[in-house]
């Protein structure tokens, strides 16, 4: 597909990747003007690239008339596939196994997948009393520790769009079953930097989650521990944070190579257009 007339295909690919990188890393939404200025592209060129990328589902226009652009569903799907790549998942599984050894409870790595939480990896504890959720399982956003963490750390426009589509189902008598209560909880999570599911999804189960963030502070995954409240009562939830945060930093490092390559690609494309 020739996105820009009169330019070599390799140059077009580099520019398209640079635009995708700018949108993916731009926070809530990125305007055409900001993308053009950031990459040193003429506005008509940037617009043609964005239009073609939008037609491919890689970007989409932000809501509420902002005129900006956000990652599209196809780009989100590709990102998820990369995160599941076997080459990096081996290192992440080893980190997760060490975390289970340290805490003595089941731990998992999750990502945001549309309007649900997807289990990327999971290592079970040796305890006979535990909950079995295999990698590939999906759970709700509004009543799980990882889900609430993702919601709390999303840009406001995207969070509002997701919450507007949510059905607030009550799973236990502790589930936050209305948006106002959930919004208060999300504010606490943003302030504290971690999330707790205190029997909100499954009675008798407590879960603590912390973010795995890239170099810009964007949440790319979550790492969590879960255990029966008989072994991990709510008042002991904070005791798991040092180990969880060490694991989160180690997990973030497994993404560094890919993020560095993307940044170099973006810088190269930008230099080539000036």
Identify what each model region corresponds to:
Residues 257-274:
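Short, highly charged C-terminal tails/helix-capping segments
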Residues 1-90, 249-257, 272:
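N-terminal helix-turn-helix
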Residues 177-248:
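Extended hydrophobic
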Residues 171-172, 203:
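Intrinsically disordered, low-complexity polar/acidic regions
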Residues 15, 92-95, 240-247:
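Hydrophobic alpha-helical membrane-association signature
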Residues 65-66, 70-166:
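Amphipathic alpha-helical effector-binding/dimerization core
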